[in-house]
């Protein structure tokens, strides 16, 4: 390229059209801290808009990051009135789905019901599927127009703190997977619907009507996920071989889904060159990190490559996230920002 992209996420934070931001990467690389930092900066830079941060990771670390308990319903972050968080529980969603299924037909020998259970159970990443449906349900309940009640919320952007890489990619496959599944259900409705109604399955039509509505929502979201004006993916990694390898694999797969990805956040960097008295281990590790950073700079020259420092403590609480997240917009400089990092470590 003839020019180097700025090493920040400024373009994402300032982009007016973004509706969805996915944050993902290998386990243990700082996805939750990064997604929380992005959400905090969005909220700070756009105080008149509402934002929602959702964890689809079964480990659920948002409560730890903000030092505040979150659950399956969106809850405001203390200290940031325009940011809400929620943690989706796939197991609870599965239980709800099983209970709802009973209302349509209590006959365990119903062949259509048995077939549907088999098909549902064969979805790759059923827990992610249920998480996805939970997100759709919640967003739809929150979406408002001019005639809705004023106490309802319309979110400008929704940020996903995703599960480790493999789960993330299955989650992103779900729109197309669910579309195929629902198409099969619709085909069954055409073939067996009249017969099931004659046999007393009057509720079958209601079920298929709901499935049609779900398919419409899934199709709409799928179109948004592949629109770079509406959706982007932020990769998170550390400067090590396995993490770099996983990041490249993930980027290639995201591109196969036609998803926009042009930003990489590299966490846990030592910057030992600027340390007055670095230990031998720090120097050795920094040399290793620098080797892979140089490879990333060459491999991802057309990406925003954001370098975040390693701290001696965890980043927890809104105030600490506000300080740390600044480095997503202004590149970290050890000589300039050293005191800020020290203050974060002392808390």
Curated annotation (Swiss-Prot):
CDD domains for this protein = ArsA
Tell me the Gene3D superfamilies matching this sequence: P-loop containing nucleotide triphosphate hydrolases
Q: Where does ATP bind?
A: 26-33, 240, 267
Stated EC number for the protein is 3.6.-.-
Q: What GO biological process terms are annotated to this protein in UniProt?
A: tail-anchored membrane protein insertion into ER membrane
GO MF, any single term:
metal ion binding
Q: Where are the transmembrane segments?
A: none
Question: Mind listing the UniProt keywords for this protein, alphabetically?
Answer: ATP-binding, Cytoplasm, Endoplasmic reticulum, Golgi apparatus, Hydrolase, Metal-binding, Nucleotide-binding, Transport, Zinc
Extract the InterPro entries matched here: Anion-transp_ATPase-like_dom, ATPase_ArsA/GET3, ATPase_ArsA/GET3_euk, P-loop_NTPase
Write out the catalytic residues in the record. 57
Pfam families in the record:
ArsA_ATPase (PF02374)
Instruction: Give the residues the record marks as binding Zn(2+).
Output: 279, 282
Gene Ontology cellular component?
A: GET complex; Golgi apparatus
Q: Where in the cell is it found?
A: Cytoplasm; Endoplasmic reticulum; Golgi apparatus
Where is it predominantly found? cytoplasm
Family membership noted in the UniProt record = Belongs to the arsA ATPase family.
The record, for PANTHER family, names: ARSENICAL PUMP-DRIVING ATPASE ARSENITE-TRANSLOCATING ATPASE, ATPASE GET3
**Matching HAMAP family:** Asna1_Get3
Subunit structure of this chain's protein:
Homodimer. Component of the Golgi to ER traffic (GET) complex, which is composed of GET1, GET2 and GET3. Within the complex, GET1 and GET2 form a heterotetramer which is stabilized by phosphatidylinositol binding and which binds to the GET3 homodimer. Interacts with the chloride channel protein GEF1.
Function (record text): ATPase required for the post-translational delivery of tail-anchored (TA) proteins to the endoplasmic reticulum. Recognizes and selectively binds the transmembrane domain of TA proteins in the cytosol. This complex then targets to the endoplasmic reticulum by membrane-bound receptors GET1 and GET2, where the tail-anchored protein is released for insertion. This process is regulated by ATP binding and hydrolysis. ATP binding drives the homodimer towards the closed dimer state, facilitating recognition of newly synthesized TA membrane proteins. ATP hydrolysis is required for insertion.
Q: What is this protein called?
A: ATPase GET3
